[in-house]
Amino acid sequence: LLAANYGNMGERQVIEAAVVCELTHLATLYHDDVMDEAPLRRGVESANERWGNAVAILTGDYLFAKASDLLADLGPEAVRLQARTFERLVIGQIKETQGPQNGADPLEHYISVIADKTGSLFGTSIRFGALLSGASTQVVEALTTFGEEIGIAFQLADDVIDIASETNESGKTPGTDLREGVPTLVTLLVQKADRPEDQKLI
């Protein structure tokens, strides 16, 4: 929505695209919670914890379907953008599940994972706003790049929150990624550190 200020903010398509992005985001959270076996989401019981994995997965699928239905009215370019974003979301999840391959640097691999899983969705959200409001091509491309970088930064900050915050502050169970062995910026940097106090976190 903020990106639409670079064009005509009054375009109804901008609002519809924002709904598409939020539905897509929510769908990925349902699926992520199943894969992570997360008991909480934003401080409340997760869907998979309350209703089971099957219902949580199907709910995520339903949200993807509703997003696709809305997209049909936004034109082929919007549909293509969403399809490519969905592709990156899935690729990011696959890369995270498989881990670094063939001696790849774990930190570089992790950055590529969050670029696909989080950066792509941020970038697409901003691109929709700029594109559908009629902003110039130069502005659309610049904002898309900016959105991806903001998405990566957001995820890196979230990694720190997972370690450093209390449940009443973040709505999350602290140390979830650490306990489950999920590589994050924090754990990857600690593994490279030499200080004894850092090694205690591993």
Task: Label each PLM-derived region with a short phrase.
Residues 1-199:
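Mg2+-dependent prenyl diphosphate-binding active-site environment of isoprenoid biosynthetic enzymes
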